[in-house]
């Protein structure tokens, strides 16, 4: 799986790259990310909106628990933006190496939740354009309107309403902090 040629990599969709990075990494993972103050602040803001969704019967859990077990799924892309220090960014073959390096061990971490199918939604990174350009979509903000838009993006998957955990990564590119997140659930419970 690690031997993907440049042309094949550049034709992958964002979802395919995530799936490939989950399946293709046998190496050890990076050290676990310790939540920053920004991550804790953001999850508090997200949970205010999430609770409203719960009361309205739109999600299964009253709040999301900050759990960085799935952070590699988004950090691998955040690191691409940080290393090239630009957004938007046209994906290159060297970006694939960053994605693989940063997502190593993700599949193993997700096994206890039922595997990669436990991932339920993501927000903060665009799907690649036809020219393979991706962008960080959401500048960091705990302001109510921005958080509501972000939560709506997280809920843009058929399994999103089942989410009980959230992993957050806040990449910094050209001095601006962005927010990215992935939600997931425990399929084994």
Model segments located where?
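N-terminal secretory signal peptides and thylakoid transit peptides that target proteins
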Residues: 1-20
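Short, polar/proline-rich extracytoplasmic segments that appear immediately after membrane translocation
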Residues: 3-5, 27-36
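Alpha-helix boundary/capping residues
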Residues: 16, 77-81, 154-157
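C-terminal motif of bacterial Sec signal peptides marking the signal peptidase cleavage site
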Residues: 23-24
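Short, well-ordered surface patches within globular domains
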Residues: 32-109
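A well-ordered secondary-structure block
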Residues: 96-189
């Amino acid at each position: 799986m690690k031997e993907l040629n440049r042309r094949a990599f550049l034709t992958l969709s964002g979802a395919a790259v995530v799936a490939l990075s989950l399946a293709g990494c046998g190496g050890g993972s990076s050290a676990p990310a310790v939540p920053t103050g920004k991550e804790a602040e953001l999850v508090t803001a997200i949970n205010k909106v999430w609770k409203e969704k719960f009361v309205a019967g739109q999600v299964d859990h009253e709040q999301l628990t900050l759990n960085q077990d799935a952070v590699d799924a988004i950090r691998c892309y955040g690191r691409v933006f940080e290393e090239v220090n630009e957004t938007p960014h046209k994906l290159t073959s060297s970006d694939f190496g960053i994605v693989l390096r940063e997502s190593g061990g993700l599949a193993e971490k997700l096994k206890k939740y039922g595997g990669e199918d436990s991932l339920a939604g993501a927000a903060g990174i665009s799907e690649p354009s036809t020219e393979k350009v991706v962008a960080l979509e959401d500048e960091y903000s705990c302001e109510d309107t921005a958080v509501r838009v972000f939560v709506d993006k997280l809920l843009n998957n058929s399994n999103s309403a089942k989410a009980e955990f959230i992993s957050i990564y806040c990449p910094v590119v050209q001095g601006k902090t962005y927010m990215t997140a992935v939600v997931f659930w425990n399929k084994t419970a």
